[in-house]
């Protein structure tokens, strides 16, 4: 759903994509925080994936943020370590596809979190399309 207008995203908008080699550094990964709930063997990583300016321009987007909560049973990886592993898996999946768009990023994150140590993944997004 477009966060600004409240309209649903169409299939054409969600599947709109660009070749990955046309856009340098298409995604920006940021770890917001790492939570260790008390009395559990769980670690929660809050990761934000943003489309960079060139990718937003190519896809006619004003803003595109994807916020993920990744619940894991892996207690060894620190925030930056998990982020680099997550980024490597997402980018390798997108490189194999050869294209990048909204749905492709979501599928790449699903690929990156399809591991035995990941128990839950919650997704929230902020997407604004250019309407002018």
UniProtKB/Swiss-Prot annotation:
Stored InterPro entries: Gemini_AL3
Keyword annotations from UniProtKB, A to Z: Host-virus interaction
Keyword presence, Cytoplasm: no
Top-level taxon of the source organism: Viruses
Transmembrane regions: none
One Pfam family here: Gemini_AL3
Keyword tRNA-binding recorded: no
Gene Ontology process terms (BP): viral process
Family indicated by similarity: Belongs to the geminiviridae replication enhancer protein family.
Subunit structure: Homooligomer. Interacts with the replication-associated protein (REP). Interacts with host proliferating cell nuclear antigen (PCNA). Interacts with host retinoblastoma-related protein 1 (RBR1), and may thereby deregulate the host cell cycle. Oligomerization and interaction with PCNA are necessary for optimal replication enhancement.
Known role: Increases viral DNA accumulation. Enhances infectivity and symptom expression.
Protein name: Replication enhancer protein
Species: Cabbage leaf curl virus (isolate Jamaica)
Lineage, opening ranks: Viruses, Monodnaviria, Shotokuvirae, Cressdnaviricota, Repensiviricetes
